[in-house]
């Protein structure tokens, strides 16, 4: 079946996720494009729904348990935020790492304090992965790592490097434990 209505419930959920409305999207995160989809699959994330525009083929790596929604080009473009969409998007369950996940073994952590440019955060997460960091901590006022621009700039690293939002009190507690 080909969805041709912009008001279809699944399309509205995808649009809400792209706009960062977690409550309206059921807490799911939207990704767009072949590369991010491949990185999400490679990282073992749980895909809930894959959206493909007409004429696109669903990648064979997508598990058969994942719901596939085929949409017209017009509907696809109305739901995603990129100017030149690739015709494939997905809703996924974002990982929810804990501070303990980042602190396991000898930690190498990056703290992003008050970083507001999503592209910069994504680049830092990608660099953190390249340097073998156990995680990235973000303080209040820092943009979400699940922001669309941050996701693209991370090139999928945000799927593998735990990014944990912490308060300033937790950062201070880490300093008293000798973490620098």
Predicted regions, residues:
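RNA substrate-binding interface of SAM-dependent RNA methyltransferases
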Residues: 42, 91, 96-97, 101-180
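N-terminal positively charged helical leader segments and presequences
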Residues: 1-83
